[in-house]
Amino acid sequence: CAVVDVPFGGAKAGVK
């Protein structure tokens, strides 16, 4: 996924 400064599921990175 993309490198964003938004927490996705808990990880503050584009790691879904």
From Swiss-Prot:
Signal peptide: none annotated. Keywords: NAD, Oxidoreductase. Its EC number is 1.4.1.2. The keyword Oxidoreductase applies. Disulfide bonds: none annotated. It comes from the Eukaryota. It is an enzyme of class 1 (oxidoreductase). GO terms for molecular function: glutamate dehydrogenase (NAD+) activity. The active site is at 12. It catalyses: L-glutamate + NAD(+) + H2O = 2-oxoglutarate + NH4(+) + NADH + H(+). Belongs to the Glu/Leu/Phe/Val dehydrogenases family. This is NAD-specific glutamate dehydrogenase.
